Curated annotation (Swiss-Prot):
The keyword Transferase applies. The gene is gcvT. It holds the Pfam family GCV_T. It is an enzyme of class 2 (transferase). InterPro entries: GCS_T, GCS_T_bac, GCST_C, GCV_T_N, GcvT/YgfZ/DmdA, GcvT/YgfZ_C, TrmE/GcvT_dom1. The keyword Signal does not apply. This is Aminomethyltransferase. GO terms for cellular component: cytosol; glycine cleavage complex. The glycine cleavage system catalyzes the degradation of glycine. Belongs to the GcvT family.
Amino acid sequence: MSAPLKRTPLAEEHLAAGARMVDFGGWDMPLAYGSQLEEHHAVRQDAGMFDVSHMLNVDVGGADATAFLRRLVANDVARLATPGRALYSCMLNPQGGIIDDLIIYYFAPDQWRVVVNAGTADKDIAWMQRVAAADGFDVAIAPRRDLAMVAVQGPNARAKVWAARPAWQAASEPLAPFSAAAVEAGTLVARTGYTGEDGFEIVLPADAVVQLWRDLLAQGVRPCGLGARDTLRLEAGMNLYGQDMDELVHPDQAGLSWTVALKDEARRFVGRDAIEQFAVPRAFVGLKLQERGVMRAHMPVRCAQGMGELTSGTMSPTLGVSVGFARVPVGVQPGDAVEVEIRGKWVPALVCKLPFVRHGKAVEHS
């Protein structure tokens, strides 16, 4: 018998709003509240909000916290010197495969926060504890299931958050992208997101999230589900763990070489040896379909250099054409013509640099 689905503190709000609920990594989550297309456009044109409380905030503290994180992840947290600053990184296994992709916040040398994906949370915690024990780091790893998280995204997102919580504006208005600030006791506002739009991700006590959700609703922020979240992140050129990368995929094969910091030779992060010895046979590219049809994950891609495969694909509501990500042979370049097999027919597609959409506007691809 399968385990019952986990529920976030906003589960009753979703049901009351008529959400279609689905199993997402063992969590009962909203797919859409009505029109997925309208939810997508709300984020691109105004403001939408997502329940992301299924994701896990993990506090990492102790005398060795910085050294531990420099060992644990491929990006170098030492570059974070200002409290509240954050970076994106992959956590690798010894073979260089991606265990998870994370956002890491710096507060003090002995005080950090790591945000991990819902479906990998238990695996991630176990791996963090294993690395800490193996190298004897003096760290405390504390999963924070007492916290909830709401992402408010779109060109009007910040203004609507401030309308709902005027007291938060002074601390959060100066934030640069990938920065966070405490706006009240126990509540963190970060200028981050997964949509390609401006906005905030708000981390707060679980018992306070329902009132925040209702107050944002009163300001005209539209609830959005996983369906719109997926089309938005695809347009924005953002990977989804478990679909675009996993433990068998190196960062270079997922378009994430920019998250691997190799400059400090003395920093031997987990997976570094494999990364340095690995000759990358595959590249990660964007594709834009040139005829009617919709690209989906696992469809074959035919290139002049050989065969590849789609990892993600959808119909782009902003562009009105199908877009996707593909792992293809090295040598495939933006501007190249390739073909995607859709229902037994080879359909032409254009290789593109990512993203497809930036701040609500189409990115030009020749």
